[in-house]
Structures are given as C-alpha cells and as structure tokens.
C-alpha cells in the first residue's frame, strides 16, 4: 500500500509544477538575466543564463520541501495531528533556559559531541527542579506531530544538507526549548525533538556535515535523507514514492522544460 495518497500526490505535483512554471516564465520574460558574477560569466559565458535559472529553480524547490513534508505527514498522522510553522510564546523556569544554553555552549566550543539521550535527561531534570524565576521568549517551530496510538509528541526542524553556521545552533536551541516546554507546561511524558535533513548531498556516502554533527547526534535526534521521509510517511517506501513523483514529473515535462531553458543558451 502506498504511503502517499493520490490526492497528496496531486498536491505535490502541483507544487513542483508551480516552481517549474515560474522559472520557465522568467526564462521567457528575461532571457539575458545572468548570475551577475563576472568570474562565472567569464568561464561559462554562453551558458550562464541557463545555469542561473536552473540554480534558482533548485533553490525554490528546496523551499517547498517543508510543504511537501506537511502534505505527506497529514496522510500518515492525520490532519489534526500535524501543525507547521507554529509561533509560540514559551514561558519556562530560568534554570531550564540556562541548561539549554549550557548544552549548546559545550557543543559550540567542541568540548563534546552531542548525545541526545543525555541532553534530554538534563532538560527533564531541570524541568523537574524548576527555579522560581521565569523567562518568556517567542519561537517559531517548523513542525509538530502527534502519534495518537502511542501518545507521543515530536517536534521537528527541517533544513537542506548544508545549513549555514548560525542556523544549526539556532535550530538546536528551539528544539530543546520546545521539548522542555512540552515536559514542563503540557506535562507530556513522551516527547522527542528531531533535526531533519531532507536529502544527503553525498549519498550513498554517509552524511558527515560537521556543522550539523557538532550539534546533533546521528544515533538520536537526527533524521537524514530516506530516514526522514520514511518517518514522516510512517512507511519505509515513502522516500522512494516521493522520488518517483519527481521523476515522473521530469519525464512528462522534459520537452517543455528543455524548450524553455535551452533558449537561454547564447549561440556564438
């Protein structure tokens, strides 16, 4: 049985089509627009406009992956158990925030590698022994999932394979704070926070981006490539199904895409 429903497949197809059409239209309206990089242009001269548009389309598709994850998750977890882009004002004891900051500082200073189980235990202990002083901060979270069958909550941050240096510790803090908030404010017993990388750009080699692995434990709290998509879809075939949707789109629209982009090649 497929994990991605027919209706969800159509939604994903429409998102991809929207991005492709956007860049085909840009190619038609502004065929001479280039990267603006004189060094790249000097090397690739005749091909820079097409490379520029393809790079833009790739970036825009990356921005749609969170929406695609939400579509798939609603199939697997139920619409009422999925929330995305949530803004929450979180009020926690001061010692909980200090615990989170200490964990991040130790990782930032490379004093130790991330150990998800140990970090989770420290946060839970801080919540069980709260200080009187409270702090309040507002955060935006990428996704919240609730597993009704097991009464288990999951909080996720989702990035591409090479997030910038400031994004990773920021995501780490948000995930730990949200997990603490779930323990302390809502008294949830089963909670996990997960950092998701939606594809491994070195596949089939292991994912080894040091910017990420300094802060996230591959043995807990980190989902990469097929592990992420299969988790979201609650099915070991989800990643393959999703990839096949993209392949099918590419095959059906190959001529249209080539006709639109090939006109950007400057013939000299």
Task: For the regions a language model picked out, list residue spans one by one.
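Active-site metal-binding core of divalent-cation-utilizing nuclease and nuclease-like domains
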Residues: 85-149
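Surface-exposed cleft-lining segments at the edges of enzyme active sites
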Residues: 54-56, 126-132, 158-166
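Nuclease-adjacent, charged terminal/linker segments that flank catalytic cores
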Residues: 1-91, 267-268
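Non-catalytic C-terminal interaction segments of nucleic acid-processing enzymes
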Residues: 3-23, 203-268
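Nucleic-acid nuclease catalytic cores
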Residues: 154, 182-213
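Conserved catalytic cores of phosphodiester-cleaving nucleases, focusing on short active-site segments
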Residues: 73, 141-162
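A short acidic (Asp/Glu
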Residues: 95-96, 167-169, 203-208
């Amino acid at each position: 049985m497929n994990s991605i429903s027919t209706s969800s497949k159509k939604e994903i197809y429409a998102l991809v089509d929207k991005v492709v059409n956007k860049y085909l239209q840009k190619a038609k309206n502004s065929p001479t627009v280039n990267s603006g990089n004189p060094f790249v242009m000097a090397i690739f001269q005749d091909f820079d406009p097409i490379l520029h548009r393809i790079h833009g389309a790739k970036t825009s598709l990356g921005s749609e992956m969170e929406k695609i994850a939400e579509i798939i998750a609603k199939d697997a977890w139920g619409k009422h158990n999925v929330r995305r882009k949530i803004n929450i004002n979180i009020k926690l004891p001061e010692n909980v925030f200090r615990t989170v900051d200490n964990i991040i500082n130790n990782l930032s200073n490379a004093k130790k590698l991330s150990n998800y189980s140990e970090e989770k235990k420290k946060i839970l202990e801080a919540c069980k022994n709260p200080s009187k002083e409270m702090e309040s901060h507002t955060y935006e979270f990428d996704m919240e999932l609730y597993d009704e069958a097991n009464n288990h909550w999951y909080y996720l941050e989702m990035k591409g394979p090479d997030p910038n240096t400031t994004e990773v510790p920021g995501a780490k803090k948000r995930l730990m704070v949200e997990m603490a908030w779930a323990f302390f404010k809502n008294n949830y017993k089963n909670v996990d926070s997960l950092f998701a990388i939606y594809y491994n750009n070195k596949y089939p080699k292991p994912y080894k981006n040091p910017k990420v692995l300094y802060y996230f434990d591959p043995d807990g709290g980190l989902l990469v490539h097929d592990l992420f998509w299969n988790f979201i879809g609650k099915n070991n075939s989800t990643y393959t199904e999703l990839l096949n949707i993209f392949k099918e789109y590419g095959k059906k629209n190959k001529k249209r895409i080539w006709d639109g982009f090939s006109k950007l090649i400057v013939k000299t």
